[in-house]
């Protein structure tokens, strides 16, 4: 079979004998060269590409020939003499790999070593770490522990073998049989009752003192309220006395005003009569001076008792009266 006319199709298999390595058709059950039967070890062949044929070669107008093949992975058309694709390096004839589902990484699922380990109840694990249940305990060497246990057991045996005659073991029984009449067993009950009574008395005293202090604290508050009411009543009486004194002063002022007006009206005809009856001017001058001085004293007394508002009113009234008297004199 010539290599030019040889075409690999899907299903062809390679002889499992390494010396032979012949590629057989898919329909053969034994090797065509060495006669070895087809087994599961025989690797299947897979065509990485297909020839384009005459029709596509004619359409390319002399660019490709009928023996050229097209890659199945990248669809690139390669020359017939190429065993691998020019673009993606896919082989033209490749061995069909078994579908195991592995990813195909480095050394994956190949020569895997499974080390069988047995769990032990020892103090340390397989990595030399101390187990959790032994971490809190201070465990020493086994020989030391055994020696300590042996010493303790020997000490206990020696203690048991000692004479017990030196110890008075019957003293407890003698003490139980002794007379209890010397001891006052009821004293504790009496003391408890006395303590309860004293506690009750102290509580009653504290309550009475508390009530007295509360009554004392309430008495100054009542005295304060009384003093406040008295001060309020005194202030109200003072305000009333002030208002009554003001009313009295007002009534007195009105009376003095009316009397001054009546005096002024009566004095003018007197002056006229005196002036007409008197014969000498000197007597008239003396009389007018004495009258003016008496009228000035009266005015001063009235103005002292009056308020500043009344003084202003009296000054205005006196000016009017002066103008009236001057007009009458004229």
Curated annotation (Swiss-Prot):
It holds the Pfam family Zn_ribbon_RanBP. Residues 150-163 have a biased composition (Acidic residues). It is found in: Nucleus. Keywords: Acetylation, Metal-binding, mRNA processing, mRNA splicing, Nucleus, Phosphoprotein, Repeat, RNA-binding, Zinc, Zinc-finger. The modification N6-acetyllysine is found at residues 18, 54, 92. GO terms for cellular component: nucleoplasm. The modification Phosphoserine is found at residues 9, 120, 153, 181, 188, 193. InterPro entries: Znf_RanBP2, Znf_RanBP2_sf, ZRANB2. Residues 117-330 are annotated as: Disordered. Its main location: nucleus. A zinc finger (RanBP2-type) spans 9-40, 65-94. It comes from the Eukaryota. GO terms for biological process: mRNA processing; RNA splicing. The RanBP2-type zinc fingers mediate binding to RNA. Interacts with the C-terminal half of SNRNP70, the Arg/Ser-rich domain of AKAP17A as well as with U2AF1 and CLK1. Splice factor required for alternative splicing of TRA2B/SFRS10 transcripts. Binds to ssRNA containing the consensus sequence 5'-AGGUAA-3'. May interfere with constitutive 5'-splice site selection. Belongs to the ZRANB2 family. This is Zinc finger Ran-binding domain-containing protein 2. It comes from Homo sapiens.
